[in-house]
Amino acid sequence: MNTFQKTLAAATLGLAAIANSAAADDLATVKTFYKIFTNPSPETHAAFLEVASEDWKSYGDYSGKYERKEALVNRSKGIVAFMPDLKFTIEGMHQDGNFVTVRSRSIATPAGEFMGIDPEGRSFDIMNIDIHELKDGKLVNLWHIEDWATAMRQMSGK
């Protein structure tokens, strides 16, 4: 191998290492989001607020409405209180450029009426799909979908 080839090979390996490091950092940043549900505390809430950009937005449908990070932190407290046995598991993560897709699972038993249904102690076990957009190492947007139709069926005993 000549000097040029050695230099090119070293540069390629160096760039690959940098890219892998950046991807690992992005995945860690995304995981910080989920800790507000899996390990709720003032520290995890503060960590999420730190990794989310000032104009972070969460979209759950095509209405054009979105939720801001402070509102999500407040709502997450209510979710965890209403479903104290909530188990949230990341089943898979995939990064493509500035986007990280997360496939996850939520299992919980609501403490009362939920989505117009009295679950009578029944739990739900559903899939969630989230797409996070990052810019300069910060979360900027989230698009998410949860399988609430399955949750409603499970809670109604059907």
PLM ranges: what are they?
Residues 18-24:
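Sec/Tat signal peptide C-region and signal peptidase I cleavage site
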Residues 1-9:
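Bacterial N-terminal signal peptides that target proteins for export
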Residues 98-110:
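A short hydrophobic beta-strand element
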Residues 9-17:
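Bacterial N-terminal signal peptides
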Residues 46-97:
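A solvent-exposed, acidic/Ser-Thr-rich amphipathic alpha-helical stretch
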Residues 24-55:
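Short acidic-aromatic low-complexity motifs
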Residues 108-135:
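Exposed beta-sheet edge and beta->alpha loop/turn motif
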Residues 125-153:
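Short beta-strand edge/turn micro-motifs at domain boundaries
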